[in-house]
Amino acid sequence: KEKDGNKRVLSGVPDALPSLIQASRLQDKARNVGFDWEDRGDVWKKVREELDELEEELRKEDKEKSTEELGDFLFSVINAARLYHLNPDNALERTNQKFINRFNYIEDHSIKACKPLTEMTLGEMDELWNEAKQNENIK
């Protein structure tokens, strides 16, 4: 606690944290003082609301407002993860690794076929992507 005893609830969350982790910590602090969903299932209405607002701003092609709404959407998804005791940072790391593995699968096939990625159609790449995905499910 600060020496003057006038500490704010969210003041202990460092600004230097990566945004995803900072969002999780801010939500934890708010929860600790009772600012939380009574029923965690209700969070999905908020996630959908934020997604709708993002889509609306994207249609308007307003980059500033779209960026703001993207942040709101991401914050709500991170909040949902917290409510379901899921670590959003770990989840994103796993997804990044899946993307790398699947893309590398496409690239490996392009090398074997002596066909540069830039000469492959999206359909060909999608087909290989789905093969990579199926191979993951077999393991």
Regions found by a protein language model. Give the residues of each.
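Flexible "arm" and connector segments at domain edges
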Residues: 1-70, 75-139
